[in-house]
Amino acid sequence: MSETINTAAQFPTFEKPTVQFNEKGWGPCELPDTFKDVPYQPFSKNDRLGKICDWTSTSNNDKKYQNKYASTFGTGNQYAYYHEEDETTFHLVDTARVQKPPHQRGRFRNMRNSRSGRGRNARGGLNTHGHGMTTLSSKNVKARDPRRGMGKRFGNRGPPPKMRESSVAVRADWASIEEMDFPRLIKLSLPNIKDGEDITTCGTLEYYDKTYDRINVKNEKPLQKIDRIVHTVTTTDDPVIRRLSKTIGNVFATDAILATIMCSTRSNYSWDIVIEKVGEKIFMDKRDHTEFDLLTVNETSVEPPTDDDSSCNSPRNLAIEATFINHNFSQQVLKTGDQEAKYKFEETNPFISEDEDIQVASVGYRYKKWELGSDIVLVARCEHDGVLQTPSGEPQFLSIKALNEWDSKLANGVEWRQKLDTQRGAVLANELRNNACKLAKWTVQAVLAGSDQLKLGYVSRINPRDHSRHVILGTQQFKPHEFATQINLSMDNAWGILRCIIDLVMKQKDGKYLIMKDPNKPIIRLYDIPDNTFDSDDSDDGEGDDGEGFQQVYNYANNSNKI
């Protein structure tokens, strides 16, 4: 049997397409209706895609390569623009420059810098080594770090700024009396205030050891831990001020309180001072169990420390470390011992009794008065830290303070071990930027006390990660009035700020008031507070109505007032 296979049903048939032959040119002979009246301009595939206008044929600033992007097909006028005067669409445009908000200023600054920056392997650029690794030279690394900080400051990039906490919680029953902003306080001036007149002097001072003037980076000396008691007694707890208030003066304070008020325009952190008005007399006090006596670190820096409290580089822990260093340094540089000579004032230390056998720090108290005009007489307790014997035999009283270096990389500062011996001015200038408020308060205290010299010590950590061991790298001395001029500190302005606050309180009724620096704004506020406020702060547990009392983080000594 045979089968016939029909292959015609399995394969499709081929139909010849109709080909149009255009004798006059190329392309189709007939144009569909959908493409009629559509302008056409010849183009080249080499032309840039997405260009809106053809600028290359009209003007070109680069004469050497004026035909660099030119095309023979881009000269048509199908898409040319012809201006027609149509006044119906005419309207005015506001050409005033719009002020950008602060968070948008400098957004594209780094983009502009990257366009004009140097290329790879060029001078100041990147150095490329094998295996695809890119490194920076040591000089370029140091030069790049400040630029990073500037980008964060001016471009507002990175995390938002950390809000500081107030030194005391403002309560609902406090009445705000006055707000004083810094621009207004800076303009105040009270000239022609004479040097204070001594009322009485107390305490005992030890003599300065001149061998510490020869210390340098190559001949450093370890900082010792000296177990001595330092009294930080407030105004109303001072028995001498209580005695003097009966006959002399109508405004009473300590040098630390006065320096805080006088240098308030340089402060960034929050602080508070309690003021009591009794009749025509004013008493300025600091609250107990607070951080008023702690020394701030990098308070006025562009990037102040913001670590957590658990870190040794947190603002509070750095302040405790700086206070610990300052107390120990001021006692170590003195000639100690029973056989060494001492300078004794008229009266003994008013804060210890004769039967107490304790080691007290070398401090001399000078009670002085100033006449501020309008029957205002200020009485304050000032302090000296040491005394220096001159060749003529006359003693020179010293105010001894210490600057501390904690981590130059984190603090955006200069390394003391590299710059202190050769460029001490650069180190001091950097400290004036980072610790302007602290240095100003030290200077004011030295001027008020009448110190002949202000001794500054440079103390650094042995290891940046170890906050318990330090070394002395050098010392420097200044005359207080000359140093005040050098750091642009005006005593006339300082007296003006103090007089302004005194006048405000004098106008109020008798009672208790509180002056506080706003933690995040350059403003000082004066509050009228109830008379029983902060009375519970004197309890034995050290806790007041503001919560937990002041406690030391590091156990530098057994007593909170010891060093």
Swiss-Prot record:
Bias kind Basic residues: ranges: 100-121
GO cellular component, one term: eukaryotic 48S preinitiation complex
Modified residues (Phosphothreonine): 128
Keywords from the UniProt entry: Cytoplasm, Initiation factor, Phosphoprotein, Protein biosynthesis, RNA-binding
Cellular compartments annotated: Cytoplasm
Domain of life: Eukaryota
InterPro entries linked: eIF3d (IPR007783)
Subunit-structure text: Component of the eukaryotic translation initiation factor 3 (eIF-3) complex. The eIF-3 complex interacts with pix.
Family classification: Belongs to the eIF-3 subunit D family.
Name of protein: Eukaryotic translation initiation factor 3 subunit D-1
UniProt gene name: eIF3d1
